């Protein structure tokens, strides 16, 4: 079997609760055991993965770590080098939206435009326009 370089995308991956973190950990470990090179590309909160699996962190604002407006505002204001996507993420959250999938998809698409040396990309529920662009290339 040909050994592949595989990217697994996960917009939010709490390592101990819920299904996403468990799924990403299990599939990345299984693919690594099969001999493939695996990178997990994730937004916060980040995974605890097997040592042989590379974790690439795509930091977002992680505004859902708190539900306090003051703390969310502080997170946003303390972010250095704000981009348009950060303003969108903050304002959408402010009005009750859940923009993490969309903003992660945008960041992942930008990352994979530069780092396009993967044989396969597996997305774990990001469901965003960025994923449509990634799908065209992989």
Q: At which residue positions do the language-model features occur?
A:
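Intrinsic-disorder/low-complexity, polar/charged segments
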Residues: 18, 80-83, 125, 136
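A conserved catalytic-core segment of Leloir-type glycosyltransferases
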Residues: 42-107
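N-terminal subdomain of nucleotide-sugar transferases
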Residues: 1-61, 113-116
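Generic domain-boundary/flexible-linker signal
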Residues: 17, 49, 66, 131-132
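An aromatic- and histidine-rich active-site surface loop
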Residues: 94-109, 120-138
């Amino acid at each position: 079997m040909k050994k592949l370089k595989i990217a697994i995308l996960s917009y939010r991956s709490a390592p101990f609760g819920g299904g996403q973190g468990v799924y990403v950990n299990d599939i990345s470990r299984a693919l690594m055991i099969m001999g493939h090179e695996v990178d997990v590309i994730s937004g916060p909160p980040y995974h605890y993965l097997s040592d042989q699996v590379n974790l690439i962190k795509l930091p977002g604002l992680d505004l859902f770590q708190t539900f306090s407006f003051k703390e969310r505002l502080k997170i946003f204001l303390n972010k250095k080098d704000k981009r348009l996507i950060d303003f969108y993420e903050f304002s959408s959250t402010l009005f009750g939206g859940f923009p993490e999938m969309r903003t992660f998809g945008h960041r992942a698409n930008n990352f994979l435009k530069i780092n396009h040396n993967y044989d396969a990309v597996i997305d774990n529920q990001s469901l965003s326009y960025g994923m449509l662009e990634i799908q065209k290339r992989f």
